[in-house]
Amino acid sequence: MSALGAAAPYLHHPADSHSGRVSFLGSQPSPEVTAVAQLLKDLDRSTFRKLLKLVVGALHGKDCREAVEQLGASANLSEERLAVLLAGTHTLLQQALRLPPASLKPDAFQEELQELGIPQDLIGDLASLAFGSQRPLLDSVAQQQGSSLPHVSYFRWRVDVAISTSAQSRSLQPSVLMQLKLTDGSAHRFEVPIAKFQELRYSVALVLKEMAELEKKCERKLQD
């Protein structure tokens, strides 16, 4: 695993209800992106470009630990600040790369970064990565990494009701037992409280709804 670690889980990409644009940052920026936007205001461009080089290396799956230490020492960045810069920039780029260029235009990308308060010269460097000559290679690497991950091959669940043996009260305590198998042969079994199961149902329904809306919006843009 690279020194940057895994990026934050991808947030869905709803459309902006006011402008009709597709937001690559989701309904609201992740904590990593919000934090890095604040730090980038005081970061010089030379250091930022070195930072971007490390992030691109991490996206390619390279081990960047030694280079990270060298950057921290040369730029006089504390370990905590450097971690925020790396994680936030990594998350920001990864979220942008998850949308195809036809759905996320450079102008919309730069406008969202401006709203975060990121300096214009740094926005230009980020846009060059997201829409420049390196984009096809980054897309290819992302596809290869995604195809190597195991997928769910089997899933089932059932409601389980346990009767309390307490002498003071006997109450029904329903829960949901889940079992799934992955394509790598591993199996997992776990128990989920009813309340959490309902949250899961709602979240899945919401994501599916927003995916459908995004697909329709992309189709309309292609038709226009």
Swiss-Prot record:
It holds the Pfam family COMM_domain. It is found in: Nucleus. Scaffold protein in the commander complex that is essential for endosomal recycling of transmembrane cargos; the commander complex is composed of the CCC subcomplex and the retriever subcomplex. May modulate activity of cullin-RING E3 ubiquitin ligase (CRL) complexes. Negatively regulates cell proliferation. Negatively regulates cell cycle G2/M phase transition probably by transactivating p21/CDKN1A through the p53/TP53-independent signaling pathway. Involved in kidney proximal tubule morphogenesis. Down-regulates activation of NF-kappa-B. The keyword Transcription regulation applies. The keyword Nucleus applies. One of its GO terms (biological process) is positive regulation of epithelial cell differentiation. Belongs to the COMM domain-containing protein 5 family. InterPro entries: COMM, COMMD5. This is COMM domain-containing protein 5. The modification N-acetylserine is found at S2. Signal peptide: none annotated. Expressed in the zona fasciculata and medulla of the adrenal gland; expressed in kidney proximal tubules. Basal expression is higher in hypertensive than in normotensive animals. Component of the commander complex consisting of the CCC subcomplex and the retriever subcomplex. Component of the CCC (COMMD/CCDC22/CCDC93) subcomplex consisting of COMMD1, COMMD2, COMMD3, COMMD4, COMMD5, COMMD6, COMMD7, COMMD8, COMMD9, COMMD10, CCDC22 and CCDC93; within the complex forms a heterodimer with COMMD10. Interacts (via COMM domain) with COMMD1 (via COMM domain). Interacts with RELA, RELB, NFKB1/p105. Interacts with CCDC22, CCDC93, SCNN1B, CUL2, CUL3, CUL4A, CUL4B, CUL7. The lineage of its organism: Eukaryota, Metazoa, Chordata, Craniata, Vertebrata. GO terms for cellular component: nucleus.
